[in-house]
Amino acid sequence: MKTAETTTMTAKKQPILKQPRALSSNPQMVFLRARIFLLIGFTFILPLLSRAEPEPAADARPRLAVPFTETSPALQADPKEEIWQKAAIIPRLGLAINPDKKGPEPLPTEVRLLWQAETLYVRFISVGPGFHVPYGNKHDAKHYEGDVVEIFLDPVGDARQLIELQVNPEGGVLDLMFLATATPQSGPYRMLTHEFLQRDWWTRQEWNFKELRVANSRHPLPDGSTQWIADIAIPAKEILRRRGQEKLSPGEFKANFLRYAGAVDPATGKRSEELFMNWSPVRHGCPHLSPEALGTLVLEKADPPK
């Protein structure tokens, strides 16, 4: 925020002129003086008052410190695997922003993260009454029409490239890349403006994550619900190309984590309710149009050898 410059002016001392007493009771002079005082107030006092007003609170975005791991996770979606106990944890996902409708309570969802130089590891632990998987393990299908977990990544942090990854409970993957051909312009909810989307936001559906590894498992819980674990290993060289790097290192990059769920109409086999959850809040159904709405991952340094 720029600091307003204060200019001090030293007025020359003027002789005191005595006015006739009758002048102060002249209505025209009284009105003129009142206007002068009001003008002084608007010119000098109001700017000071406005400067004293606190700045609007920034649209805070979440941050998470992610520990380095010497041991690679087994990528078997094993709920008892101990290495995940050392991971950074996002304990819950909140509902996406939907000003048109108040959604139900979010379903229990936890995200865990670890990193090595070659890989970013992500584990989703999702609980629900059941999971809708209309496209099975087909690649690049519309998996968002069923139950999925989603990852959005912007390793450079300038909102010019957005990588999207969706994974469903049967191992189906949808991977996309979005590219901006100009400086992003966002409106409400940090969603790209209509004009920008029409002109400068490009989707590359033909792009695929090379060497991506995914593992899933499902486990019945005592209350009748089901736990779904998705382990995802993201190769560093696939997300660091714009940096000119192939390995992760301590530092920051932008990310978001989401889950799509909702009740299904048995008659149609389609969703009768949309339950969209996210780590960093985005407009309902529009995370792929909100590259400036991501949170921040802070990759921590490895512990020195003992």
Residue ranges: model-predicted function:
Residues 17, 22-24, 29, 40, ...:
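Intrinsically disordered, low-complexity segments enriched in proline/serine/threonine
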Residues 32-34, 50, 146:
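Residue-level micro-sites within transmembrane alpha helices that shape
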Residues 1-33:
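N-terminal secretory signal peptides that target proteins for export/translocation
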Residues 16, 23-24, 43-45, 88, ...:
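Alpha-helical transmembrane segments and their juxtamembrane interfaces
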Residues 34-47:
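Bacterial N-terminal signal peptides
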Residues 7-13, 17-18, 48-60, 305-306:
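Basic/polar N-terminal segments that are highly enriched at the extreme N-terminus
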Residues 30-32, 48, 60, 256:
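Short alpha-helical segments used as structural interaction elements across diverse proteins
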